[in-house]
Regions:
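Catalytic beta-strand/loop cores that center a nucleophilic Ser/Cys/Thr
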Residues: 21-28, 70, 154-242
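Residue-level signal for short, function-critical loop segments
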Residues: 48-49, 252
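Bacterial N-terminal signal peptides
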Residues: 5-15
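Nucleotide donor/acceptor-binding cores
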Residues: 40
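A glycine-rich, often tryptophan-bearing local segment used as a flexible ligand/cofactor-contacting loop or short
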Residues: 104-181
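Extracytoplasmic/secreted proteins, especially bacterial periplasmic and envelope-associated proteins
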Residues: 60, 64, 113, 117, ...
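Extracellular ligand-binding/catalytic regions of CAZymes and related secreted enzymes
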Residues: 19-37, 64-67, 71, 212-213, ...
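Helical hinge/lid and interdomain linker segments adjacent to catalytic or ligand-binding clefts
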Residues: 23, 44, 50-130, 134-137
Length: 314
């Protein structure tokens, strides 16, 4: 760690000690826009508490995203907690729905009759954004989600190692506006299950995982499919035939990564794009104070609170 980084860490430590990092009472929840609002509503749904401190901080991460989205004029983000809104009518006024939560069989959208109801909303052209574990679905549910997002993490097919993704280049797309190549460590999933021929899919973030991550307990047919030194898609956009837009982003395991400007800008750009909001040529405004990494956290573990520090630049 450099002297500057260490000094900044000390400042952050002293600042965090003055506030309660677990106080979530100041985050507005399920607040509709005023009746005369003419812009776009974006529903940001945070999952229940998960994993250890600093990982899967869905509530705090979603609160950060809402604050970032508010920096774009004409956008009204609505924050929801615990995986599903108490007022389901919020889905109907949202231009796009963002899910940041645990997935697979416990994914909130696959419970009861929710998948069929959400499918009707998607067919009406609403945006669909899944962040990190929320892109993970069982194959029986993923077949439906393919039509919303163009791809998903399928157990026993996809991989979920922790590694440093080096994003060396970016495609020309509204979602990459203002985003520079970057390298950051995360639990970057790869070998996603995509629609046939990638039709409608635009890879946004791609990198080559270390070959050491390509083993594990995956079936032989998967290992054969995942070749050595293969470029993998870690985030993607999907233009649906119905006119709706989907975005999948496999990062977001480590809460600290929201302090990286390029990391958060590509996500905010994508959310805006999914809601059919014009992304500025220089990218969305994503001003952020690293002190906010230590606000609105879920209380996890029994040990002494350890402040979350921004990631070190690679």
């Amino acid at each position: 760690m450099t002297r500057i980084a260490a000094f900044c860490g000390l400042i952050l430590l002293s600042t965090c000690s003055a506030t309660d990092p677990y106080d979530q009472s100041q985050v507005p929840l399920e607040v509709k826009p005023p009746a005369d609002f003419k812009g776009k509503v974006i529903l940001v749904v945070a999952g229940k508490s998960s994993h250890g401190p600093g990982d899967h901080e869905f509530f705090a991460g979603s609160a950060i995203l809402c604050n970032l989205l508010k920096q774009t004029p004409g956008v009204w983000p609505i924050m929801v907690r615990d995986g599903w809104p108490k007022n389901e009518s919020l889905f109907e006024i949202a231009e796009s729905i963002v899910m940041y939560m645990d997935g697979r069989g416990g994914h909130p959208v696959v419970q009861k009759d929710r998948l069929a109801a959400m499918d009707q909303r998607m067919k009406a052209g609403k945006g669909w954004v899944n962040l990190h574990y929320a892109v993970d679905y069982l194959a029986k549910d993923g077949k439906t989600v393919l039509g919303w997002m163009g791809g998903y993490y399928e157990p026993d097919w996809s991989y979920n190692p922790h590694w440093d993704a080096e994003i060396r280049s970016l495609p020309k797309h509204p979602v990459t506006r203002g985003v520079k190549p970057f390298t950051i460590r995360d639990e970057w999933y790869y070998n996603m299950r995509f629609v046939d021929d990638f039709k409608g899919v635009t890879p946004i973030l791609q990198a080559i995982p270390p070959d050491s991550t390509r083993g594990g307990a995956a079936p032989k047919e998967v290992k054969k499919h995942v070749g050595a030194s293969k470029l993998e898609t870690l985030a993607w956009c999907y233009d649906r035939p119905d006119g709706g837009r989907g975005f999948g982003f496999t990062g977001g395991h480590f809460h600290r990564n929201w302090a990286d400007e390029d990391f958060r800008r590509v996500v905010v750009n994508a959310i805006l794009w999914s809601a059919k909001v014009e992304v500025p040529e220089s990218g969305a405004k994503v001003e952020f104070d690293a002190v906010d990494l230590n606000k609105n956290l879920d209380k996890k573990g029994k040990g002494e609170f350890k402040p979350i520090l921004p990631p070190m630049k690679k």
